[in-house]
Regions:
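Short alpha-helical transmembrane segments in multi-pass integral membrane proteins
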Residues: 1-18, 76-141, 185-241, 297-363, ...
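N-terminal transmembrane alpha-helices
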Residues: 5-42, 56-71, 75, 100-107, ...
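Transmembrane helical elements of multi-pass membrane transporters/channels
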Residues: 16-35, 137, 148, 171, ...
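Transmembrane alpha-helix boundary and packing residues in multipass membrane permease domains
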Residues: 21, 25, 37, 74, ...
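Alpha-helical transmembrane segments and their lipid-water interface positions
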Residues: 28, 32-39, 62-69, 73, ...
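Helix-terminus/linker motif at the lipid-water interface of multi-pass membrane proteins
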Residues: 30-49, 118-125, 181-188, 248-277, ...
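Small-residue-rich hydrophobic transmembrane alpha-helices
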Residues: 48-108, 145-164, 271-335, 368-382, ...
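Short runs within selected transmembrane alpha-helices of multi-pass transporters and secretion channels
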Residues: 69, 138-156, 164-175, 193-208, ...
Length: 459
């Protein structure tokens, strides 16, 4: 069911729209966590390290899929808010075609460059074979990753956050069951973990695309949509390319950090792999909520209801802080139990590393959540320059501080770099948002850009 986000009390609208998104990403992260958890419990510490080591490289591919998601989602939201349904369809068609080409290129790069990428991050010899095996199967499933992300972006743009939730809930439960069967009973090791994800993502992707086209069929318009539009493609690129660059540079930064971590041995790698999965559960959840705020912002921008944007910003901050409280308490108080899920009692050093990481990062979720909400408004308003500056500042600081402190303090210096980067990145995002609000750039200038974009699309 499509939902108009331009009417109703902003706080109530956002809670109703974003909570299913939050539930969706929780399920998605659960089956990501299941990969590491089952590998660590039933195959061993090296298997956990191999999956965690490969994960940082998979984030580069996810960055491109996410860029397609947010680029399509923001533009579709704007046209849906403006009731220009023919342009909604044109945007979807254009994204699917361009996404297919991009996916094919990345698959070629991945298949031929897999070993080189693992070597570049100083992957230890004892986990090289498993890391490469996991990564190759993951790359084979890239079409499912891409088209599923595009589909969920379309659902969100149309105000439908419940359908992706149902898909992900079913897929995640199936993935966890298949992980267990493939690894525990069929003894497939790391390959079993990867194939379980491949199969479940494939089924979810096909079902999601079918439902997307059913939803599009319900949008009636006198004007005819086209299968590819260069003006629409360029609009998508103005949002997607900065998002891809931002996510890619973040992934590259994480890979650099992973290469620093790899110098401390398999135990530290395994501890980091467990902790970063738990950390990413929170960060990715907040990022997904911020994407919902981007859709809310973009729909209201398209409808010309500018006064609702700041109300949505304030409601978003309340929402993420409300969710942060139990998550911070859980990680600080029950961190040992959470990390223990990924490994057995013999992995004492790895467990200590994971617990330390969680206790350093968790209190700062209140800070980074503000940045992510602010970034959501900036993206929804197509203020990609400001968004990228704040994000790159965070990234550069984290990588630089990690490199310097790790040589002096050991691995604890790496974990300490995150809060500093988050804090300064948040301050920059808030600065750009309030400057835009004060100067009415967010309101008036974007209205002019929207008019110009509509004129370009007149046929």
């Amino acid at each position: 069911m499509n939902k108009d986000l331009t009417t109703g009390k902003p706080e109530k609208v956002l809670w109703g729209f974003c909570l299913p998104l939050f539930g969706s990403i929780i399920f998605q992260q659960l089956y990501n966590i299941a990969d590491s958890l089952i590998a660590g419990k039933f195959v061993g510490e090296n298997a956990l390290a191999a999956v965690g080591n490969s994960y940082e490289i998979t984030l580069i591919f996810i960055a491109f899929a996410f860029g397609c998601n947010i680029g399509c989602s923001v533009i579709v939201s704007r046209y849906f808010g403006a009731k220009e349904y023919h342009n909604v369809r044109t945007t979807v068609h254009t994204t699917l075609l361009s996404g297919a080409v991009l996916c094919a290129l990345l698959m070629l790069l991945g298949f031929f460059g897999c070993h080189k990428m693992l070597t570049m991050i100083h992957t230890p010899e004892e986990i090289m074979v498993d890391s490469r095996l996991y990564l190759m199967i993951y790359i084979a499933g890239l079409p499912f990753l891409f088209f599923y992300n595009i589909a969920t972006g379309i659902f969100s743009a149309l105000g439908n956050s419940k359908t992706p939730f149902v898909f992900l809930a079913c897929s995640s439960v199936a993935n966890i069951i298949m992980d267990y069967i493939f690894v525990r009973f069929l003894a497939m090791g790391v390959a079993g973990v990867a194939w379980a994800t491949f199969i479940c993502q494939g089924i979810s992707c096909v079902l999601a695309i079918v439902v997307v086209f059913r939803h599009l069929g319900a949008l009636q318009s006198e004007k005819k949509a086209v299968w590819f539009s260069m003006p629409v493609f360029l609009q998508i690129c103005t949002v997607a390319i900065p998002s891809i660059l931002q996510q890619s540079f973040v992934s590259v930064g994480n890979i650099i950090i992973q290469s620093l971590i790899n110098g401390f041995g398999a135990s530290v790698i395994a501890g980091y792999a467990a902790a970063i999965k738990l950390n990413n559960l929170v960060i990715t959840s907040f990022t997904t909520l911020a994407n919902g705020i981007s859709n809310y912002t973009s729909q209201n921008l398209g409808a010309g209801k500018y006064e609702r944007i700041h109300d949505g910003f304030k409601a978003g901050i309340k929402m993420v802080w409300t969710l942060s409280v139990p998550l911070v308490l859980l990680y600080v108080i029950a961190g040992r139990w959470m990390v223990y899920l990924f490994m057995d009692s013999s992995s004492g050093s790895a467990m200590d590393t994971g617990i330390l990481i969680l206790r350093i990062l968790a209190p700062f979720y209140f800070v980074v959540s503000v940045k992510l909400v602010t970034d959501g408004v900036l993206r929804g308003s197509s203020m990609m320059g400001a968004f990228m500056i704040a994000t790159f500042t965070d990234l550069i600081l984290r990588v630089s501080i990690a490199a310097v402190l790790s040589s002096k303090l050991g691995s604890i210096g790496i974990w300490s770099a995150w809060p500093v980067g988050w804090a300064l990145g948040t301050m920059l995002s808030l600065f750009f948002y309030f400057r835009a609000k004060k100067n009415h750039f967010l309101l008036k200038s974007r209205e002019m850009v929207q008019i110009e974009e509509e004129e370009k699309l007149e046929v």
